Amino acid sequence: MDLKQYVTTVENWPKEGITFRDITTIMDHGPAYKYATDQIVEYAKELGAEIVVGPEARGFIIGCPVAYALEIGFAPVRKPGKLPRKVISADYGLEYGKDTLTMHNDAIKPGQKVLICDDLLATGGTVEATVRLVEQLGGQVVGCAFLIELLELNGREKLGDLNIKTLIQY
């Protein structure tokens, strides 16, 4: 299935000069959403993933159905103040400043094989911070899966030799 046909391109959003790739039109189309999920599920099986981790909010949309299909857990990564128990945190750079991601300090067991899922690989900042959170807890990132990769932003460079799967590239 050609998933690109289900992505809506929105020019000049959220600001002038930005081309936004809207994945909600993949989610609107049940067979496309299922196909995308199934592709990532097969990848997760090949890697022997034991838990899925996803940054808010679209990482939940991608990662939760994968975890469900595999009958494994899902661990959310969130902005500060959104998780109720003790957390660990990792800062990451933005174009103008920095942001922070958090994760429950007991979300990953030492040695656990982790698949990170998100909607988009752009600069790699969010996923790189997510990798650091997993590694702080002793987890082993066996792969990262994304619906879309924006090649011109070189996000893979920030991720070193991590195993990466993307379903659509622009």
UniProtKB/Swiss-Prot annotation:
GO biological processes: adenine salvage; AMP salvage; purine ribonucleoside salvage
Pathway(s) the chain acts in: Purine metabolism; AMP biosynthesis via salvage pathway; AMP from adenine: step 1/1
Q: Could you confirm whether the keyword Transmembrane helix appears in this record?
A: no
Give the source's domain of life in one word: Bacteria
Reaction catalyzed: AMP + diphosphate = 5-phospho-alpha-D-ribose 1-diphosphate + adenine
Instruction: State the family it belongs to.
Output: Belongs to the purine/pyrimidine phosphoribosyltransferase family.
Output this protein's name: Adenine phosphoribosyltransferase
